[in-house]
Amino acid sequence: MFKDNFSNNEQWRYVADDVMGGVSTGYVEYQIIEEDIIAVLKGNVSTENNGGFIQIRRDLKDINLENANSVKIVAKGNSQKYYIFLRTTGTILPWQYYASEFTVNEIFNEFVLPIKDFEKSGFLLAKKINPKKITSIGIVAFGRDHLAELYVKEIKFTK
């Protein structure tokens, strides 16, 4: 099953709403905190100009997730709501995804997000995710004007 502790951070890429004309700004950096590599997503999320997101995303096309039941993330941050976005072979358009939210505080916590509870972004998508069809995962600050500051220690799929 998939587990990532950011030891190979070249597999993750930063994406913002500027790809569609938005004005959100941000970046990802990798820090070592107590011997762990931490992905830090920071920025200013703006809904101006039809925008409203910054994220880091990783391709999962070559990973067998057929038996996955949940996404587990260990994270902390600035007491804001963040999201995990999953894309599948059925999310053809760039704005299609399945989402689940979690709210962080100033200490690292483990969040378990059942795949069956991810919500589709539009009516054209299947109601539920087939785990073997997952093609990417995104860690996302989304949907409202806010400052993002999210520290992620680990993310994985579990049975």
Model-inferred region functions:
Residues 1-159:
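Beta-rich carbohydrate-recognition modules and glycan-binding surfaces
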